[in-house]
Amino acid sequence: MENFINLITDVWNRGFFGIDLGSIISSLFIILVAFLLRGFIISVVINALSRLAGNTKTEIDDEILNALKKPLGLIPITIALYICTLILPLTGLIDEIATNVVKTFVVFTIFSALSNSIKPIFAALSAKSWLTIAIQLWLERAAKFIVWVIGIAVILDIFGIQIGPLVAGLGLFS
């Protein structure tokens, strides 16, 4: 019986790839709570802000808030991933990759919010614009494309991929 208890203790302490099961269970619990908080933030906090935005005279704040629902829902998940990197005893290359994944989530959240904000901004500007609808749609899509290209460039830079030679190799700025 004592050998069985020692076996259980050994499995608990070594766990999976040398990470104890307590840290793994804690990390999984934090991620689960983050997904629950994501729903809470989207349903409660955004709806409260929507009521406040509904009291204003303009519609642009309502539209931007609706556009930011999904990107703001990524914030708890990003924080949970960061906390998981602190809890788990990661070292070396695995720690570097985990840190880069958290940075990628931060960048993706920021650029997703920027990209989703473009449509309401263009909608607000379209009422006073002298541009045709086709040009406005083209400019809106071009702006979203540029935002995502910059976001992808930042993410590639996080993982150590040099962006300058890629852009120069394409011959875009010659």
Which residue ranges define each predicted feature?
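Short, strongly hydrophobic alpha-helical membrane anchors
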Residues: M1-L21
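Hydrophobic alpha-helical transmembrane segments and their immediate juxtamembrane helical boundaries
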Residues: G22-S174
